[in-house]
Each structure stands twice: as C-alpha cells, then as structure tokens.
Amino acid sequence: MIIRRFVRHLSTSKSSIRINAVGIQHLAPSLQNQLFGKSSPRLDEDLINMAKRHLKSNNLIGKKSSLNDPIEIQLPSLQGNTLDEHFYKLGSASLEPYNPLIDELLNLNIIEPQFEFAFQSGWTRYAPGEPSEKVPYPLEDSYFFDVETMYKVSQYPVMAVALSDKAWYGWVSPYLTEESTTNDHLIPLNTFETEKFIVGHNVSYDRARALEEYNLKQTKAFWMDTMALHVSVSGMCTRQRGTWIKHNKKEQENTMSVASIKSKVQNEELQELLDSTSIEDPMLEDNPWINKSSLNSLERVAEFYCKIKLKKDIRNSFATEDPDELRGNFDELMQYCAKDVFATGKVFQKVYPKFKKLIPHPVTLAALKDISSCILPTTTKWEDYIETSERLYQESRRMIEKNLHVICEETVKLKDDPTKPWENDPWLSQLDWTIDPIRLTKKGEIHKNQKLPGYPNWYKQLIVKNELKLTTKTRTSPLLLKLAWNGNPLYWIQTQGWCFKVPKNKTEEYEKLNFVMVSLKKLSEDPGFESIRAEDLKNFTFVKVPHPDGPSARVTNCMTKSCLGFFEKGFLNSQYPLAKDALQMAVASSYWTSSRERIMNQFVVFEDDMGYILPQIIPMGTITRRAVENTWLTASNAKKNRLGSELKSLIEAPKGYCFVGADVDSEELWIASLIGDSVFKIHGGTAIGWMTLEGTKNEGTDLHSKTAKILGISRNEAKIFNYGRIYGAGIKFTTTLLKKFNPALSDAEAKATANALYTATKGISGRYDKKSIWYGGSESIIFNRLEAIAEMAHPKTPVLGAGITAPLQKANLSTNNFLTSRINWAIQSSGVDYLHLLIISMDYLIKLFDIDARLCITVHDEIRYLVKEEDKFRAAYALQISNLWTRAMFCQQLGINEVPQSCAFFSAVDLDFVLRKEVDLDCVTPSNPDPIPCGKSLDIYQLLQQEDIKGADFPRTMHLNDVHYRKRTPVIEMFDKAVDDKTRKFMVSLQIAQDKTEFTKWKRSRGELIVH
C-alpha cells in the first residue's frame, strides 16, 4: 500500500537546532528520529573530554562554527528498523528479478558447440536434439554473449554468439550475407519486454552493439562483466602489475626450456620427473600474491580460473577490410567467437561465487546494473566538434612548423659561411655539421643517388622523401630555437635527457637548489660522449632539466605542457618568440592531441538529429572497485586555452529532458575523517573531522588552508598534498611535489617543510606493545585507524563490508606488505560504497516517486541522471534524500547515530541541459567560441521552495516485506570489540599526546586513565 502525506517545511524554531559537544550542528529532531529512531545516542564523557583536549591542542576548540536553519522534511519510511536493513532490502529488491536468471547460468553444464553455424542473417537457435531455427532474438532471459566486429572498417557488429541454459545462438550481420550494402546493423535482444541477465567479458563492448540499448528508455537488461568481477576479486594494484608481468615472462621462459629438454628426453621415467618438477622461484617466496592474480584479458582470466588456454591467433582475421575473407572462413570465426563465450561462461561460474563471498552486500551487485547501463545523448554538433577541433589543431601545427622551418632553413645557410660560426655556438655546435664529399660521375656530374649533396648531416636527417620533417617534438628543435635554462644553453644527453650546462663556479649554487648534476662517469657512459667538446667537460657542469616525476626521470621534450610553468616563470627561455608560441600551441593542443584518437573512435549511433554513445565502462575496473572508462570518466573540464576541452558539453539532453546531478562534497576526505571521528563516537571529534565539517577558508580553519600555511603554497595546491597523504603517500611524495611547485626550493628546505607538514598532520611515530603508533598530529588517530584496518587479515570496508582483493590480503603478502595500497583501498573502496548506496537509493526513489529518469554517467564522486523536464525538481529532491540516507548509513555503521547537517545534503544539485562540471561554466575554448547558456544550481533550501516540491504529496513507502534481512554486526563494532573499553581509551590517550614527553608519560601511567 502507498501512503501519501504532506512532506516538508523549514523549521523556524531555534529549539530544533541541535549542537554536539564540540560545536557541530546535527540534524533537526524530526529528521534524526526518522533516520535513527527516538532513542538518544549514548555519549561517553571520557571520550568527549579527550576529543576536546585533542581539538584544543589543534587550536580548534571554541572556533567559530556555522549555524544554519534546521531542515525538517518528511522522508519516505525506512524499509526496516535500521539503515542497514533499509539498504539491504533496497538492494535485494532490485536484484530479485535477476536472481533466478543468475542461478540458471551458475548451474549450466557448459559444453562447446558440436555443430556448424548456419551462414544466414539474424539469429539462429541451436538447441540439443532439435533442428536449428531462425529466431528474432535469444528466447531465454539469461545467457553468455560475445560480439565480433571488422574494427578497421566499422564499429558495427558482423557476428555474435550467445549461450543460454537451453541453446546456443549465432547472429550474422545482413552485411556479411550480402543482403545489405551497409554495415550499420545492431543486434536485437528484446530487452524491453522481460528482465535479462547478459554476461560478457568487457561486456560494455558487446552492449554497444545491442539494438535496444540506443533508447532514452532504459532496458531491463543487467549486463554483467566478468572482467569487473575478476578485478574486484583477484585484481592487482598498480605497484604489483610490473612484478607480475616480470614473473610471468620468466615463468614462460622456464616452461619453454623444460619443454625443450623434455622433447629431447627419450626415457619415460625422466619425462614423468620433468612433468612433476616445479622450478623453484625466489620471486614467488617474496611475492606469494603472484599466484593469486592475472592480467584482465579473457585469455589470461580463463587460464587463471579454469586452466583454459584460448587460441587467439584467429582474431587477427577480424583486422581485415575485406568481408569476403570472413565469408570464406565463416564457421571457424563463429567457433572462435563461441569459444570465447564458452570461456566467459566457465569464468563466470568460478568468479561469481568468489565475488559474492568477498562482497556479500546486495547493494554492490545491484548498483552494477545501473553503472553498466549508462547512456550519453548527443547531437549532430558532435561531428562539427570533431571537424573544428581537428582543423584548428592542424592549422596551428602547420603555422608553428612553418616558422620553425624558416629558422631551420636560415640556420642551414651557415654551412656556406667560411668562418664556421656554429663552432662557437653552444646550441648549433651540438648538431652534426659534417658534409659528406660530393660524389661525381665520370663526366664530372653530381651522382644522382646522393641525398642532398653539400648539406650537413643534421639537416639531411630531417629530410624524408624530399620533405622537411621538423616539428616541436623533433630533437633538433630546442637547439634551433636556442632554448636555455636561466640563460644556460640546453644540451641533449641520450641517457639523461635534456640538460643545461653551467660554469663550474656556479655548480654549488645549483646543487643547493637540489638540481641533479650529471657526473663525469655518467657522461662517459653516454653513447654521445665523444661528441662533447673537451672545453665543455673542463669548464662546465651538466645539470638535468627538472622532471615532474622526480630526479630519476629524464625530460625528452621541452615543448610540452609539463614545461609550460618553467617558461611562464622565466626558467626556460629563448631568443625566439616562436619558442613560447610553439609551447603555448603544444599546451593548447595537449588535450586534443592526447584524446583525439579516443574521441574520434567513439561509437555514436544517430537517429535523425539525436545521437547516442554507450560509454565503454568497466563497472569495477580497479582493485578499489572504481568504474573505469578511458574517455568520459577522464574527460577534463572546459578551459579557455585548451582546444577540444569542451568535450563533455557535447553531451546534450534531448528536447524535453535535462541532466540532474551533484558532486559529493569532499567525499573521501569526509569518509577518512569519519573513520577517525568514530574513535570518539562524535562528529568533529578529531581535528581533521572538525576541519572537514566546520572549517572555512575565511577563518583559515579548513584542512586545505592549514596545509597551505604550513607549506607556503596556494590552497588549491594544498588539496593535492592532503589527498595524497590521506591515501597513504609519504614524505618523499610531498618533498618531490614541493619541488615541482617551486623548483627554487633546496633539497633541505623541501625536506624540512615536508617533515613539518607530516609532524603537524600524521604526527610522530612511537612504539607501544611492540607496535608502531602515530601520535601528536591532527590526523594521527585517522592513520592509526586506517593502518589497523589495512593490517587486518581480511580487511573490509567499514560500511558495506566489501573485502580486499586476494593479492592484497595479508596471507598472500611477504616482504612487501603494500601498506600504502591497502590504506588507499580502504578509503577509495569506501568511496565506491558511497556511490553504490547513492545509486540504489535513487533506483528505489525513482520508482517510488514515479520519476522518468535513468543514470547517465557517474565519475567517482559525481553522479548525473537524464530526467524528463517535468520531473527535474522531484529528481533533485530524490537525490537529496539519497545523499541523506547514504550519509546516515555511513554514520550508523561507524557507530555514530547522528548526521552533521553541514554534509547531510548536497551543497547543490545541478539542473542542466549539457554535461559540465559547473552550471555556470561557459565552455568557451579555442574550438568553441560561443558561450553555452547557464543551467541552474539549487541548494536544499532553494529546492524546498520550488512549487513542485513545496507542499507536494510524495509516496511514503513501497511494499518490500518479502525481502528477508540478515542482520550483521558493523565492521567497526567488531573491530573495536577486539580490545576492552579501558584499553581502547588508553590507546586514544597515547594518540592525542602532543609530544614525546607526554606520550612517554601516558605509556608509564598505563593503568590510570586521565581524560581531563
């Protein structure tokens, strides 16, 4: 039964303002009761007093905190007694239609096809014991699926294979059977009529070839990606990947050598011995996790889980541009496709149960359905955008190159100057001015087969097919442009990259600034050592041009975005204005040059003036379960000097629709601070928690302002340091980054500043009970908490209880414990929990409020829905409720039955007709000179004043009583139960000690707790 009721009003009563013991405003009583019930949360006075002492030592107690009008709205009823029960039921209800379909595939006895595929267009069904029959689409509702394309010709499919529990299916494009002269055919799957569960490896590629998916209305298909399941269960972190590849290569070499020996051994007993012999591998002893993972391709994953060896050579057939080659090899190619389907099915049956065991909460699985069903609508402007961006890029490139060629041609004329002026020029002397003797025929004529007789070698190397090939990327260009660092000429050294030479008497000056000197030994090992002039070696020191990635990296191109800052600050200079023009062109084009191929290869399906892009999302593409996609999830925001950077704004809502979305404010920073606050069981109990919730730029009490002050950098730059630190990055990272922002800092200054930051934030490292412990910093409590979670035998995210991947579980680690990666996992994976909760809330409220909306795209802490225009305010309202429920779930799971009002709701919900970071971003770029009109942005107060919300009736509940809830103990509660109350408080006292003296005092007073 649905009950309707008047839903909202703003409280004008000051008595409804609730402030906690450290000055954080909580929700109004009515909202508090709806979320957590009427019983008041119990507070521990000892912990409160310790929190106050900790805040006082960080100069935060008594600081100004904000008070806002309490918000009192009638929420839809929770589905159960707790937020965990509520979300469990929401997730389970969303999955309910798909569970029997999943079971069908899990119980399927998968056998490879024992028949030839019919060469006929459309779908053909092959059921055991029955004649093959032509069908409009697969008749069953769950199946494994794989698609193949002639990718050099078109992104449209040419063939596909599916396997259900009843039959095999083959689909053939009418283009391949020559019933159509065009190749623009999509695959019908009938996904609007009934729920479908479709499994593929990197299934977003297959989904993009499904006919029904190109529709504003969302289909009932659940696209399940075995690659995503594998990554979440057995994926490696970035730092492990190189080691795995190195080991795998070595293993293959060893296997080949054993096979070679075996082939030459005639004795049967020796052959058996070789079969049973495993080669001892010291790398495995240090890295036992290697055997717990694989790379992500189907070939690797099938071998890892199922010992299936896929032969992938035949896939090269799809690189052809001649369809006759496919027609002539049709059945073999269909069998290849079927083998991939077979392997995908086997992998799914192995990895899905592991996934359910490791990540059991239904919210995670349910959220994958929407993430895998994203859609990006566009218009014919898409084609104009590509044409304009490419044209401007080519025009700019040609202009710069033309001017560069002029300099080159002027320079080469010096060859005729008898004084050889290049010999005393520090740049031009690096070029090879050798002119090979002109070969003459017997008649005294110049021999025809000579390349540019009479020209120096450096110039001849630039001529390809009688054309000068010289760009800003060419190694010769910085020398022709006479680039210098602080007036010191640049010099190319193969093993060190671009350097500059400074007089010996200035070497110490650069050493103090932590520049990297190139030793004589390293110079002597360089292939070009002999070309360095003796007087240069005697009178100059060679110094490396700084690289953003640190001292060991080498700069190979000075005309890139990473060097722009050096030009702007005057470190890099040239006598030619063209140098800066070229660099600015390189910077302006940097986005387009790095993204153009991906953008041009987007598969856009047009219907009249509307186009649709199905983003190629891997819904769990990293070990933290973040979604991955290489264009839309990494697209930058529009910048006035970046060609093509208005990309996102090309995603435009169709007429009658708009985008409704929001960014989660300081999502991962808040999660980290909440994990710390859970120690005191009060919001804002830690310094970082208080700064995250109440700190302001004006007061200088927010985290970024504090860090900026310590480091002497801008607040914006400070954000990078803060997030890096929270993710587990150390002092080395901070020192390197400081040098990047200010190359003039000496090594000692950078290290001292970084140490000061870490002492003030992470704190001092102490020892207690044979374990290390951080104390004295504003973030010590958080880091101790995060490290403790990361050091668990089976770490779980605090909210949804998602487990860490096998290669990062403690039992599979040895000499390298990958602690930084595991801390990073705890935060980022919790951020993914947040997103999944938000999506499932919206999924429920869209149905409850009867809103015409679907998920458009999500990028980590951003979420955007495509919504019917008349539903936009109700969709915004649903988003605000979803955020409130999600924050409340986080708080409750971390042991605090309160929500701070400052973060309960999105700071704003955006209503817009294009995708962009901010509604007032005009998206003007070199390729888009016309500003895009602004959208709307509404905070919760403004939203509640809209006529569609003000005084409206909203449904209160939906019948979900059939869902059985399995109660669980919160992860943090289990974690805290490991020690008794007195010990826990003692450990808190150690962590909030301000210095070594106080820390030692607390260690000695082990039994007598003082909290005042």
Swiss-Prot record:
- An annotated GO BP: mitochondrial DNA replication
Against InterPro entries, the record matches this protein to: DNA-dir_DNA_pol_A_mt, DNA-dir_DNA_pol_A_palm_dom, DNA/RNA_pol_sf, DNApol_Exo, POLG_palm_dom, RNaseH-like_sf
Q: Which reaction does it catalyse?
A: DNA(n) + a 2'-deoxyribonucleoside 5'-triphosphate = DNA(n+1) + diphosphate
Enzyme class label: transferase
Per the record's keyword annotation, is Magnesium included, yes or no?
yes
Question: EC number(s)?
Answer: 2.7.7.7
Main location per the UniProt record: mitochondrion
SMART domains in the record: POLAc
Keyword terms, alphabetized: DNA replication, DNA-binding, DNA-directed DNA polymerase, Magnesium, Mitochondrion, Nucleotidyltransferase, Transferase
What cofactor is needed?
Answer: Mg(2+)
Q: Where in the cell is it found?
A: Mitochondrion
Q: Which GO terms describe its molecular function?
A: 3'-5' exonuclease activity; DNA binding; DNA-directed DNA polymerase activity
Name the GO cellular-component terms.
gamma DNA polymerase complex
What is the stated purpose of this protein?
Involved in the replication of mitochondrial DNA.
Q: Known PANTHER family for this protein?
A: DNA POLYMERASE SUBUNIT GAMMA-1
Record-stated family: Belongs to the DNA polymerase type-A family.
Q: Any miscellaneous information on file?
A: In eukaryotes there are five DNA polymerases: alpha, beta, gamma, delta, and epsilon which are responsible for different reactions of DNA synthesis.
Q: What is this protein called?
A: DNA polymerase gamma
| Source species | Komagataella pastoris
Its lineage opens with: Eukaryota, Fungi, Dikarya, Ascomycota, Saccharomycotina
